């Protein structure tokens, strides 16, 4: 086929035409590419890379055509909840530790909110157990296994106080994932990071932690100016092989990251939160200069190149001033001055001129001016090497979830580090939120209005009749006899003040306060009756009733208050022997708060009304009305609250009445188990009782809980296990069938043995030795406890005051065991040492090898602050915010009620204690029950204060209140063995008659 050309007769073929078109198009394309490529070599309107135009165009073209954006949305400060985090306990570095914990929580939450996963570098066990890079460099790293995982596609790489030890940042950045760091990046050359001192020597930070370790490391310049950094990009082996031809041409793949930093922690301005966001990856020639400007991360050089021996660091302040921190290498002294002033001073010709200019600028502090002059002259000094004693740790603090406290506020002290990490906590008794929460948890939430059935009420009446026995015409003690029996120092002081008005009707009011003692949950409340006249009035009857009835022969087998330690151990061993070891431990949950008004009326009140002569009944009913329905207020803070009908812990009736309620529950269980038995025979089967502690026969293990519920009470039952011993009155009987040896409950004791609540003005050595001396009297052979006490005595002994000075203090016995103040001690036989160790191992969960190592550690210690703490696998702390956050179970449906009560009781503008006594009714008061108040005149709510000795927060004065805080002294019961009387009846049959009928 031919094509005719209009401009001539020449003809061409189609093939020739298509070939021509291809040639023309190719030439055009080449021309276009050349023009575009040549365009990459254009001269920019700002500085450009060196080299010729061809290489410059080649580099620009490769970067432009290979750039790959990486889209990541991440802003961690959206998860910032507080800038002043606080810890519940002071471990020597509470503030810096709280900031680290808060940073960890912030990082975790911010990652979770964007759906990412966490990949952490050398985390602690409480942080993560997931994918991580974990090498063993520090002792703490051994808590987790060695791992070298790779970050996932959605991973955020996290480092908390570890980036200093990285050899090069590219090992973290090459994954092209966000990097989040909590790091130390100081703005001054020495000083304190919150509560931990640091210095800088040879460009290395020397950071020493009170209650922790010492660290030496350089610092990366994350916070330097320049927002973009470059890194290599990690490739798999397969990708690396595919890219090998490109690498042979001199190409490399790099990534660009945007770097951010902030300093959100008010108390730790030298701590920074650093995070990088990957932006792009590109290919580029290594042999051609790049025009993309980034900064290179490097170690910070603190040394001043113009002043050898000095460090210098500049930073911009919050009000946009350029400041300079200067100080000698390795020294703690540093000063901060405006840079323009320092530059001006550096140009002066004489030191006198420097001083004159500083004074003229308003700097008159000799310390400040001297430091500037020394820097001006470049004066160097030889560093002294001396040991440093760092601040001791403070007790672990119970921190209610509703508390508004900023810092822990406790007066208790530690004299060694805790023996076990899950130690007891001290309540913040100066905080009104602590009082409010204790009221809710120990009074309001457990209030009991349950009325038993007719059958159970009949059993209770039967118990009262058996308990009273033949006594129907008792006489109360005289006032003189009662005053003689009230021998506590605080009571004697009050009695002398009111002796002339002894016949006046006492005031009806309760002033409560938190007991300053360590515990694992909300602190106990002491509901005290401040009017000593009321104590005298009640004690006339309670003491007479205890002497005549409760210590009578027919009650001595179960009523244990008033017995000596030897009498208690003999009675317990006899009871366990009678039962052939088939016994159970009973322990009521919050018996004081859960006792109902019905129980108090129909057991305790009924017993006394029937035992005393008729003319005393009105007075008995009167003081029982007061105990059950008396109005109450917080002694320290002044707010009123509804105290409920429970037992009031500051009343003389507390221990004897609680013991009666305890025995009544067991008697009810015996009636359930043996419904056809003789009442007198069942009564003789009651086990030892003292307050809410008790022992009972194992035959009623299934019925005693049912009996407790009939009265609205909660009871915990444990069957005696020879491997863990038998616990009664916080003493563990190691083998009651064969030996009377007892030991302190080891776990409970080890949790609090390192704490003293003595007045802080008393030297710590005196307080420590006074405390451990008591344990060495009662537990001289108890493993761990005795060795620990001897260690404290050995190391603190040379530092104590003289024996006369220590004995002269009124609080000398404040922390002595109750039994020691009563001239009694628990029996311990040295030959039972192996058995005692086995019980300690079983009850604490600490294996025998660890116990032996710890005992050896105590013997070898040279300093009381050496680390001895054993890590607990789990915490038993409750109703608190602990070191790692809110303790499990502390936030539940009760939180709203706690907050409501807190708001109701709060005072406008303050949460601290009142400076004045309680005033008249205010809008802050809670409604009070008035239907069942005792009859008679009521005084105004504006009550006069009692004697100052009763209310001073002074350990020496308050000691009298705690010297006999346990079981009241009384008449020691006597009598012969009761084995035959206690023989258990056969099931379904009537028990045999006792051999010694009463």
From Swiss-Prot:
It is found in: Host mitochondrion outer membrane. Residues 985-998 have a biased composition (Low complexity). RNA-dependent RNA polymerase, which replicates the viral genome composed of 2 RNA segments, RNA1 and RNA2. Does not need an exogenous primer. Also possesses a terminal nucleotidyl transferase (TNTase) activity. The TNTase catalyzes the addition of nucleotide to the 3'-end of plus- and minus-stranded RNAs, probably to repair the 3'-end nucleotide loss. Forms the open necked connection to the cytosol of the virus-induced replication vesicles. Mediates viral RNA1 recruitment. Homododecamer. Forms 2 stacked rings of 35-nm in diameter, arranged in a crown-like structure at the opening of virus-induced replication vesicles. Interacts with protein B2. The chain crosses the membrane at residues 21-43. SUPFAM superfamilies: DNA/RNA polymerases. InterPro entries: DNA/RNA_pol_sf (IPR043502), Noda_Vmethyltr_dom (IPR043647). It is a single-pass membrane protein. It catalyses: RNA(n) + a ribonucleoside 5'-triphosphate = RNA(n+1) + diphosphate. Its cofactor is Mn(2+). The viral bipartite genome is composed of RNA1 and RNA2. One of its GO terms (cellular component) is host cell mitochondrial outer membrane. Residues 44-998 are annotated as: Cytoplasmic. Coiled coil: none annotated. Residues 91-282 are annotated as: Capping. The N-terminus is important for both membrane association and mitochondrial localization. It may also contain a RNA methyltransferase (MTase-GTase) capping domain. The C-terminus contains the RNA-dependent RNA polymerase domain and a structurally disordered region at the very end. Residues 901-998 are annotated as: Disordered. Its EC number is 2.7.7.48. Belongs to the nodaviridae RNA polymerase family. This is RNA-directed RNA polymerase.
């Amino acid at each position: 086929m031919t094509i005719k050309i209009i401009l001539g007769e020449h003809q061409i073929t189609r093939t020739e035409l298509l070939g021509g078109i291809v040639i023309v198009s190719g030439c055009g394309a080449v021309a276009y590419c050349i023009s575009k490529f040549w365009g990459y070599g254009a001269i920019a309107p700002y500085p450009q890379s060196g080299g010729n135009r061809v290489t410059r165009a080649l580099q620009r073209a490769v970067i432009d055509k290979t750039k790959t954006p990486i889209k990541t949305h991440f802003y961690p400060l959206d998860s910032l909840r507080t800038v002043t985090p606080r810890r519940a306990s002071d471990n020597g570095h509470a503030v810096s530790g709280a900031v680290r914990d808060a940073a960890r929580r912030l990082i975790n939450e911010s990652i979770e909110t964007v759906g990412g996963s966490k990949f952490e570098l050398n985390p602690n066990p409480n942080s993560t157990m997931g994918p991580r890079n974990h090498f063993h460099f520090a002792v703490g790293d051994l808590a987790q296994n060695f791992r070298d995982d790779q970050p996932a596609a959605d991973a955020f790489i996290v480092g908390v106080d570890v980036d200093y030890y990285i050899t090069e940042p590219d090992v973290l950045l090459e994954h092209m994932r966000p990097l989040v760091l909590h790091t130390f990046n100081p703005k001054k050359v020495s000083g304190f990071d919150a509560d931990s001192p640091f210095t800088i020597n040879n460009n290395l930070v020397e950071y020493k932690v009170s209650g922790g370790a010492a660290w030496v490391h350089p610092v990366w310049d994350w916070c330097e100016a320049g927002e973009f950094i470059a890194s290599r990009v990690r490739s798999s082996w397969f990708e690396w092989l595919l890219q090998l031809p490109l690498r042979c041409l001199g190409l490399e793949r790099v990534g660009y990251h945007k770097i951010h930093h902030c300093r959100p922690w008010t108390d730790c301005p030298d701590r920074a939160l650093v995070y990088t966001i990957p932006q792009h990856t590109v290919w580029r020639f290594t042999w051609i200069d790049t025009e993309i400007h980034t900064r290179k991360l490097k170690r910070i050089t603190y040394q001043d190149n113009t002043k050898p021996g000095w460090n210098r660091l500049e930073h911009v302040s919050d009000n946009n001033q350029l400041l300079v921190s200067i100080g000698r290498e390795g020294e703690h002294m540093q000063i901060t001055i405006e840079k323009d002033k320092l530059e001006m001073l550096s140009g002066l010709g004489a030191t006198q001129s420097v001083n004159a200019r500083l004074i003229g600028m308003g700097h008159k502090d000799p310390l400040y001016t001297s430091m500037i002059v020394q820097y001006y002259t470049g004066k160097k000094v030889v560093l002294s090497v001396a040991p440093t004693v760092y601040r001791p740790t403070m007790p672990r603090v119970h921190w209610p979830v509703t508390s508004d406290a900023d810092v822990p506020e406790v007066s208790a002290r530690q004299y060694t580090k805790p023996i076990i990490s899950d130690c007891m906590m001290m309540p913040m008794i100066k905080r009104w939120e602590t009082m409010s929460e204790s009221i809710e948890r120990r009074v309001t939430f457990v209030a009991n209005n349950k009325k038993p059935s007719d059958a159970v009420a009949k059993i209770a009446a039967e118990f009262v009749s058996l308990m009273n026995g033949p006594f129907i015409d008792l006489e109360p003690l005289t006032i003189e006899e009662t005053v003689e029996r009230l021998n506590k120092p605080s009571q004697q002081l009050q009695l002398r003040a009111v002796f002339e008005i002894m016949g006046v009707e006492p005031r009806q009011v309760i002033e409560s306060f938190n007991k300053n003692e360590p515990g694992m949950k909300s602190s106990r409340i002491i509901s005290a009756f401040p009017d000593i006249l009321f104590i005298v009035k009640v004690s006339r009857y309670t003491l007479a009733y205890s002497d005549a009835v409760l210590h009578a022969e027919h009650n001595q087998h179960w009523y244990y208050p008033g017995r000596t330690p030897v009498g208690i151990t003999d009675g317990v061993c006899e009871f366990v022997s009678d039962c052939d070891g088939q016994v159970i431990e009973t322990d009521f949950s919050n018996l004081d708060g859960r006792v109902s008004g019905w129980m108090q009326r129909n057991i305790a009140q009924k017993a006394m009304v029937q035992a005393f002569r008729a003319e005393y009944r009105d007075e008995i009913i009167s003081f029982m009305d007061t105990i059950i329905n008396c109005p109450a207020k917080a002694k320290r803070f002044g707010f009123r609250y509804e105290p409920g009908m429970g037992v009031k812990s500051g009343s003389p009736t507390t221990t004897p009445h609680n013991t009666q309620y305890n025995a009544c529950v067991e008697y009810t269980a015996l009636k359930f188990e043996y419904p056809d038995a003789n009442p007198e025979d069942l009564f003789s089967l009651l086990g030892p009782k003292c307050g809410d502690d008790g022992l009972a026969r194992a035959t009623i293990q299934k019925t005693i809980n049912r009996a407790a519920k009939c009265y609205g009470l909660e009871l915990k039952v444990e069957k005696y296990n020879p491997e863990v011993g038998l616990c009664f009155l916080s003493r563990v009987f190691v083998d009651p069938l064969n030996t009377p040896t007892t030991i302190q409950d080891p776990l409970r004791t080890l949790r609090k043995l390192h704490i003293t609540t003595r007045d802080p003005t008393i030297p710590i050595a005196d307080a420590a030795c006074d405390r451990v001396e008591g344990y060495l009297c009662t537990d001289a052979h108890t493993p761990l406890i005795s060795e620990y006490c001897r260690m404290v005595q050995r190391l603190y002994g040379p530092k104590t005051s003289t024996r006369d000075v220590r004995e002269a203090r009124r609080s000398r016995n404040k922390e002595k065991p109750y039994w020691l103040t009563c001239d009694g001690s628990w029996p311990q036989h040295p030959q039972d040492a192996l058995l005692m160790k086995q019980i300690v191992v079983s009850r604490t969960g600490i294996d025998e090898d660890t116990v032996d190592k710890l005992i050896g550690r105590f013997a070898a210690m040279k300093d009381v602050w050496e680390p001895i703490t054993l890590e607990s696998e789990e915490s038993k702390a409750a109703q608190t915010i602990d070191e790692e956050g809110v303790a499990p179970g502390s936030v539940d449906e009760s939180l709203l009620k706690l907050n409501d009560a807190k708001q109701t009781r709060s005072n406008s503008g303050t949460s601290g204690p009142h400076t004045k006594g309680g005033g008249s009714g205010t809008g802050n008061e809670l409604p009070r029950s008035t239907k069942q108040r005792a009859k008679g005149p009521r005084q105004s709510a504006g009550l006069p204060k009692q004697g100052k000795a009763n209310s001073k927060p002074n350990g020496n004065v308050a000691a009298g209140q705690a010297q006999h805080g346990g079981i009241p002294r009384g008449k020691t019961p006597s009598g012969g063995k009761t084995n035959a009387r206690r023989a258990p009846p056969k099931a379904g049959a009537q028990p045999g008659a006792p051999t010694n009928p009463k």
